[in-house]
Protein backbone atom coordinates (compact mmCIF):
# COMPACT_ATOMS: atom_id res chain seq x y z
CA UNK A 1 0.00 0.00 0.00
CA UNK A 2 1.15 3.51 -0.55
CA UNK A 3 0.69 6.36 1.88
CA UNK A 4 -2.24 7.88 0.00
CA UNK A 5 -4.34 4.71 0.31
CA UNK A 6 -3.63 4.31 4.00
CA UNK A 7 -4.45 7.69 5.46
CA UNK A 8 -6.16 10.92 4.61
CA UNK A 9 -4.26 12.92 7.23
CA UNK A 10 -0.81 14.38 6.76
CA UNK A 11 1.97 11.96 7.61
CA UNK A 12 4.11 12.90 10.61
CA UNK A 13 7.34 14.72 9.81
CA UNK A 14 10.41 14.77 12.06
CA UNK A 15 8.96 17.62 14.15
CA UNK A 16 5.79 15.62 14.78
CA UNK A 17 7.88 12.56 15.66
CA UNK A 18 9.83 14.65 18.18
CA UNK A 19 6.58 16.02 19.67
CA UNK A 20 5.29 12.48 20.23
CA UNK A 21 8.43 10.58 21.24
CA UNK A 22 10.61 11.73 24.16
CA UNK A 23 13.80 10.37 22.57
CA UNK A 24 16.55 12.64 21.25
CA UNK A 25 19.96 12.10 19.68
CA UNK A 26 21.45 9.57 19.85
CA UNK A 27 18.37 7.54 20.85
CA UNK A 28 15.78 8.89 18.39
CA UNK A 29 15.78 5.99 15.94
CA UNK A 30 12.99 6.86 13.51
CA UNK A 31 13.58 9.56 10.89
CA UNK A 32 10.22 9.74 9.16
CA UNK A 33 6.85 8.08 8.71
CA UNK A 34 5.92 6.98 5.19
CA UNK A 35 2.58 5.24 5.85
CA UNK A 36 -0.03 5.34 8.61
CA UNK A 37 -3.42 3.77 9.12
CA UNK A 38 -5.10 4.66 12.43
CA UNK A 39 -5.09 1.78 14.93
CA UNK A 40 -3.76 -0.56 12.24
CA UNK A 41 -0.22 0.06 11.00
CA UNK A 42 2.62 2.51 10.64
CA UNK A 43 5.69 2.35 8.43
CA UNK A 44 8.71 4.39 9.44
CA UNK A 45 12.23 4.87 8.13
CA UNK A 46 15.58 4.87 9.94
CA UNK A 47 18.55 5.86 7.80
CA UNK A 48 21.61 4.10 9.18
CA UNK A 49 24.86 6.05 8.67
CA UNK A 50 28.47 5.45 9.64
CA UNK A 51 28.15 8.53 11.89
CA UNK A 52 25.97 6.63 14.39
CA UNK A 53 27.87 6.72 17.71
CA UNK A 54 27.50 2.98 18.38
CA UNK A 55 29.54 2.02 15.30
CA UNK A 56 32.74 3.22 17.02
CA UNK A 57 32.59 0.18 19.28
CA UNK A 58 30.20 -2.24 17.55
CA UNK A 59 32.37 -3.26 15.73
CA UNK A 60 35.23 -1.01 14.51
CA UNK A 61 36.43 -3.41 11.79
CA UNK A 62 32.93 -4.55 10.71
CA UNK A 63 30.27 -2.05 11.88
CA UNK A 64 26.92 -3.67 12.68
CA UNK A 65 23.88 -1.98 14.26
CA UNK A 66 23.32 -3.56 17.70
CA UNK A 67 20.25 -5.78 17.79
CA UNK A 68 18.91 -4.00 20.85
CA UNK A 69 18.84 -0.73 18.85
CA UNK A 70 17.01 -2.42 15.97
CA UNK A 71 14.42 -3.52 18.55
CA UNK A 72 14.31 0.02 19.97
CA UNK A 73 13.69 1.48 16.51
CA UNK A 74 10.80 -0.97 16.02
CA UNK A 75 9.44 -0.03 19.48
CA UNK A 76 9.57 3.67 18.52
CA UNK A 77 7.54 2.90 15.38
CA UNK A 78 5.00 1.14 17.63
CA UNK A 79 4.97 4.19 19.92
CA UNK A 80 4.28 6.50 16.99
CA UNK A 81 1.42 4.24 15.88
CA UNK A 82 -0.13 4.41 19.37
CA UNK A 83 0.32 8.19 19.73
CA UNK A 84 -0.94 9.06 16.24
CA UNK A 85 -3.92 6.72 16.66
CA UNK A 86 -4.97 8.30 19.95
CA UNK A 87 -3.62 11.85 19.66
CA UNK A 88 -6.98 13.53 20.34
CA UNK A 89 -7.60 11.43 23.45
CA UNK A 90 -4.04 11.56 24.81
CA UNK A 91 -3.13 15.18 24.29
CA UNK A 92 0.52 16.05 24.74
CA UNK A 93 1.21 14.96 28.31
CA UNK A 94 1.78 11.22 27.87
CA UNK A 95 4.72 8.90 27.40
CA UNK A 96 4.81 5.36 26.07
CA UNK A 97 6.75 2.73 28.00
CA UNK A 98 8.07 -0.53 26.62
CA UNK A 99 6.61 -3.40 28.64
CA UNK A 100 7.81 -6.54 26.83
CA UNK A 101 9.50 -7.89 23.75
CA UNK A 102 8.74 -11.48 22.76
CA UNK A 103 9.82 -13.73 19.92
CA UNK A 104 12.60 -11.39 18.80
CA UNK A 105 14.48 -12.78 15.82
CA UNK A 106 17.38 -11.28 13.90
CA UNK A 107 17.65 -12.39 10.28
CA UNK A 108 20.44 -10.27 8.81
CA UNK A 109 22.95 -7.65 9.98
CA UNK A 110 22.18 -3.96 9.57
CA UNK A 111 25.19 -1.98 8.36
CA UNK A 112 26.09 1.63 7.62
CA UNK A 113 24.32 2.77 4.46
CA UNK A 114 21.27 0.58 5.05
CA UNK A 115 17.80 2.06 5.29
CA UNK A 116 15.60 0.32 7.85
CA UNK A 117 11.91 0.17 6.99
CA UNK A 118 10.11 -0.22 10.30
CA UNK A 119 6.67 -1.81 10.07
CA UNK A 120 4.44 -1.77 13.15
CA UNK A 121 1.03 -3.47 13.14
CA UNK A 122 -1.38 -3.14 16.04
CA UNK A 123 -2.74 -6.53 17.11
CA UNK A 124 -4.94 -5.38 20.00
CA UNK A 125 -5.32 -3.06 22.96
CA UNK A 126 -6.40 -4.66 26.21
CA UNK A 127 -6.54 -2.98 29.65
CA UNK A 128 -4.11 -0.27 28.62
CA UNK A 129 -1.64 -2.70 27.05
CA UNK A 130 -0.87 -2.14 23.36
CA UNK A 131 0.26 -5.28 21.53
CA UNK A 132 2.12 -5.00 18.22
CA UNK A 133 3.82 -7.14 15.62
CA UNK A 134 6.92 -5.30 14.37
CA UNK A 135 9.39 -5.92 11.59
CA UNK A 136 12.53 -4.20 10.36
CA UNK A 137 13.39 -4.58 6.68
CA UNK A 138 16.42 -3.64 4.59
CA UNK A 139 15.16 -3.56 1.02
CA UNK A 140 13.28 -6.82 0.50
CA UNK A 141 15.19 -8.64 3.26
CA UNK A 142 13.73 -9.07 6.73
CA UNK A 143 16.36 -7.90 9.24
CA UNK A 144 14.42 -8.44 12.48
CA UNK A 145 10.97 -9.13 13.88
CA UNK A 146 9.37 -9.18 17.31
CA UNK A 147 6.15 -8.96 19.27
CA UNK A 148 6.19 -5.71 21.25
CA UNK A 149 3.97 -4.63 24.14
CA UNK A 150 3.75 -1.06 25.41
CA UNK A 151 1.66 1.02 27.76
CA UNK A 152 0.82 4.71 27.60
CA UNK A 153 1.02 6.66 30.87
CA UNK A 154 0.64 10.28 31.89
CA UNK A 155 4.05 11.98 31.96
Curated annotation (Swiss-Prot):
Keywords: Cytoplasm, Lipid A biosynthesis, Lipid biosynthesis, Lipid metabolism, Lyase
GO CC aspect terms: cytoplasm; membrane
SUPFAM superfamilies attached to this UniProt entry: Thioesterase/thiol ester dehydrase-isomerase
Annotated active site: 58
Entry keyword Lyase: yes
Keyword Transferase: no
Reactions that this protein is recorded to catalyse: a (3R)-hydroxyacyl-[ACP] = a (2E)-enoyl-[ACP] + H2O
CDD domains: FabZ
A GO BP annotation: fatty acid biosynthetic process
InterPro entries the record matches: FabA_FabZ (IPR013114), FabZ (IPR010084), HotDog_dom_sf (IPR029069)
E.C. code: 4.2.1.59
Disulphide linkage map: none
Cell compartment(s), UniProt: Cytoplasm
Group of enzyme by EC: lyase
Alphabetized GO MF terms: (3R)-hydroxyacyl-[acyl-carrier-protein] dehydratase activity
Pfam (any one): FabA
Similarity remark: Belongs to the thioester dehydratase family. FabZ subfamily.
Role of this protein: Involved in unsaturated fatty acids biosynthesis. Catalyzes the dehydration of short chain beta-hydroxyacyl-ACPs and long chain saturated and unsaturated beta-hydroxyacyl-ACPs.
Protein name: 3-hydroxyacyl-[acyl-carrier-protein] dehydratase FabZ
Amino acid sequence: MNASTETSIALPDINDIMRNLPHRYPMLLIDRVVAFSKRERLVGIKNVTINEPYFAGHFPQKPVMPGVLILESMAQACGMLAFKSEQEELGGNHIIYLVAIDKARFKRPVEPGDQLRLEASLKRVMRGLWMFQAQAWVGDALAAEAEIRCTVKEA
